[in-house]
């Protein structure tokens, strides 16, 4: 069964494909407190997602993480013992890749959020660079999030977990996800033998390759971390012109809320 990486099992979203709860990093280890300064914890209408700060006023997450009431937490490591420089924001405006909320295609699961107030760079807060070029096959990339660390049980950690996975041939994902186009604006990434994966609660979080955000956690298998079932990540590089255009003030070709 195809799994959308969202936390609440009872949440019903109007998508054109089957879904379940969002996902956490399985097979990883607790992240170092200083290696995820860009990572955002998103609470959206009772569900948990991840996100990525790309400059002091803008962040990226998955479109399916959208909600009427969203709280965005920056500079967080331990949820139980927050860092002193933790900052909380809400969206000032949300932008979806032209009408992506319809979810008629796999490659539109991206949301650009303008914060109600800029965040201040600090010990635990700093943006992640946008991609200068797309990653090649077999590139080693990092995934991270507060999602569940068990592929079959909901065991959520206090601190984000990190793991390394690889960019894999897109044919691997096309074999598992019906209707996925060969030239889809997505990346296929994982470990072919299984054991490492994003899982429930990780939706919207980053796929980081060579120090840049290359993907956004979108869709995966259920249970998580199964062999030869890689995760689909929205390909940030293919949305780069749109992202830069929105930030520059050109909102004509989008569906803002």
Curated annotation (Swiss-Prot):
It comes from Trimeresurus stejnegeri. One of its GO terms (cellular component) is secretory granule. This is Snake venom serine protease KN8. It is an enzyme of class 3 (hydrolase). Keywords: Disulfide bond, Glycoprotein, Hemostasis impairing toxin, Hydrolase, Protease, Secreted, Serine protease, Signal, Toxin, Zymogen. Residues 1-18 form the signal peptide. Monomer. Residues 25-248 form the Peptidase S1 domain. Snake venom serine protease that may act in the hemostasis system of the prey.
